[in-house]
């Protein structure tokens, strides 16, 4: 029985090593095999043939990041809700209650963000 567990961990270890090794090898080979001919034209930014007239480093207000995080949270919620909605007939009442608890937890978080006035635009 122990060999089954060891086998499972060995597969995970192999995938972990391959997941690290293959990108490192690909990036290293790409760096060694690519032509390296730096020039001033390659160092400039290019957008529609027009030279840039100001610095590309722009600071964004922190509220934009909060909106982005809230979007990601509710986007992931739809990823969890979709398989549940597809298999709704087979899952039964327990899955309905479980999903309702999940949605209520997210709505409580949204209500908390609303109460703290996080959702007000600048």
UniProtKB/Swiss-Prot annotation:
Catalysed reaction equations from the record: a quinone + NADH + 5 H(+)(in) = a quinol + NAD(+) + 4 H(+)(out)
Transmembrane segments: 10-30, 66-86, 91-111
Enzyme class: translocase
Subcellular location: Cell membrane
GO cellular component, as recorded: NADH dehydrogenase complex; plasma membrane
Enzyme Commission numbers on file: 7.1.1.-
Gene Ontology molecular function: any one: NADH:ubiquinone reductase (non-electrogenic) activity
Family in the record: Belongs to the complex I subunit 3 family.
Functional description taken from the UniProt entry: NDH-1 shuttles electrons from NADH, via FMN and iron-sulfur (Fe-S) centers, to quinones in the respiratory chain. The immediate electron acceptor for the enzyme in this species is believed to be a menaquinone. Couples the redox reaction to proton translocation (for every two electrons transferred, four hydrogen ions are translocated across the cytoplasmic membrane), and thus conserves the redox energy in a proton gradient.
Protein name (Swiss-Prot/TrEMBL): NADH-quinone oxidoreductase subunit A
Organism listed in the record: Bacillus thuringiensis subsp. konkukian (strain 97-27)
């Amino acid at each position: 029985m122990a060999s089954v567990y060891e086998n499972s961990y060995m597969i995970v270890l192999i995938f972990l090593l391959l997941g690290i090794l293959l990108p490192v090898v690909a990036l290293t080979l790409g760096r060694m095999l690519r032509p390296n001919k730096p020039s001033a034209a390659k160092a400039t930014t290019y957008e529609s043939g027009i030279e840039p007239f100001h610095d590309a480093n722009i600071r964004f207000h922190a509220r934009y990041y909060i909106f982005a995080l809230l979007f990601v949270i509710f986007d992931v919620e739809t990823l969890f809700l979709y398989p549940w909605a597809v298999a709704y007939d087979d899952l039964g009442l327990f899955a309905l209650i479980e999903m309702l608890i999940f949605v209520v937890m997210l709505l409580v978080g949204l209500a908390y963000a609303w109460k703290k006035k996080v959702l007000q635009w600048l």
